[in-house]
Amino acid sequence: SEIATNKAFELYQKFDVEKGVDDIAASLRWLRENENTSGKTAVVGYCLGGLLAFLSGCQLDIDAAIGYYGVGIEKNLQHKNMIRKPMMLHFAENDAFVPAETRKELEENFSDSDLVSLHNYKGCDHGFARTGGGNYDKAAAEISDTRTLALLKKSLT
């Protein structure tokens, strides 16, 4: 609904991204200390979570970072030289939140990177991988999820 969307944008505007990364760091510490885990970690995020995954891949000791239609990555490129592990970023061709100019800027910034892969999905919009969402695109979601799972398998095993 429009009310829910407006509330979501209000909360988004108030969100402290660095505190979000700190929360992820705390979660990762707990996972690494838990004897029932392998100690390997990855961060996967969608929308704002895509930005958090990007920043986690830059600032934290993780084995992989994956972002779907991450908003605001272009404003945080000063961290890109800190990437030490594989990162995959998925974008939608028709995404007004991550427009063509932004995707081009990201492609230019990561074109020579062996660690960062960018994937653009033609004819798709923001939220294309969210099952049940208005912009859900089954084919693109399956392709992006297959790519994501392959990176996770390679990085975490």
Predicted regions and their residues:
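N-terminal cap/leader regions of alpha/beta-hydrolase-fold enzymes
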Residues: S1-T157
